Amino acid sequence: MSEHGSPESQWRAETIAVHGGYRPDPTTRAVAVPIYQTVAYAFDDTQHGADLFDLKVPGNIYTRITNPTTDVLEQRIAALEGGIGALALASGQAAITYAIQTIAEAGDNIVSASALYGGTYNLFAHTLPQFGIETRFADYRDPQAFGALIDERTKAVFVESIGNPRGNITDIEAVAKIAHAHGVPLIVDNTVATPYLQRSFDFGADIVVHSLTKYLGGHGNSLGGAIVDSGRFPWAEHKQRFRRLNEPDVSYHGVVYTDALGPAAYIGRARVVPLRNTGAAISPFNSFLILQGIETLALRLDRINANTLAVAKHLQGHPKVAWVNYAALPDHPEHALVQKYLRGHGSGVLTFGLPGGRAAGARFLDALQLFTRLVNLGDAKSLATHPASTTHRQLDAAELEKAGVSEDTVRLSVGIEHIDDLLADLEQALAKA
């Protein structure tokens, strides 16, 4: 993040998205961020190499850990979210995994909202338990439910700012107060909202994770993920709960992260332990492409928000549509939260159902000509999927209900095309459903 009081620290999101973390290269004067497609970096001398490995001086060792292109991406994302630092990774799933593994180990638990992206639910419900980390699921609509599940081995509370695919809006401020009352950080997946619509740290979140593959990259061409650290959670005040940050790390010559890195202890350990040791490093080329996408984030989101609201209103009045779920609609039960957290916008994901259930949904999807049938979201192109058959296919009926995914749910990720063309495609597909 930029120094407090510097011009960059006063920039709005639109400006940060274009300029954050980079000035023209001092050697070549290149205005575009260079792609440093290298594996390793030369040391000045033996002592310089030793100091780098001891974390005594900043610098690059190996692209698995740091890379100059990726460093610009990390600075830009941290500035957009208002954090102290960021760690870019190979995917959003890697970001979520490392966000937990940085502070949790066998015998620990996390408390998570049950309304989650299907991949995250599977990670929490089935994979983390294989490493001895339990996930306790709470109803996102009841902040007190999170507190009831926290104990002395709880390492984090996890929610999505806007749920995928449900489009539900989390009352982050209320959940943060519950988490902090128990001495536990709040991790928010801000993928669907993006920092353009919501800076989760402003409402009490401590850690933010992103799938950069989605709206920040914005063009469906690069996998990436990120963890952003607010630098505000008092890890050193909770030494017993967060021992890995407050006790010597034998794998790094006994460094104590809270002593060596202060408020950046968490993001520092995320880089030099889970990333260094398990290696989900982002490609410098992907970092470059995602940086290109971020430059147009505000323009794309403005168009996407307008298009999605128009689509939601059109579907809401359609005789072949049973229900529409989009929180930016005035009659949505979470509309007040959209006003509080998202400046009145609902982002680009909406869900709706057809009276004919799964079969009608399949006919609708198969009839689409402009919307692309796939499971990504956040693209400049409009996308459609049937979650129960794809992203949430591994969930049983009870798990689908907890996640808020019904058999008839169709998810749209609306893009930047002309609204009349989008509505025409939906209309002809509905006629065949």
Give the predicted meaning of each segment.
Residues 2-8, 17-26, 85-317:
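Conserved PLP-enzyme active-site core in the AAT-like
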Residues 42-46, 234-235, 297, 331, ...:
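Short, acidic Gly/Pro/Ser/Thr-rich loop/turn segments
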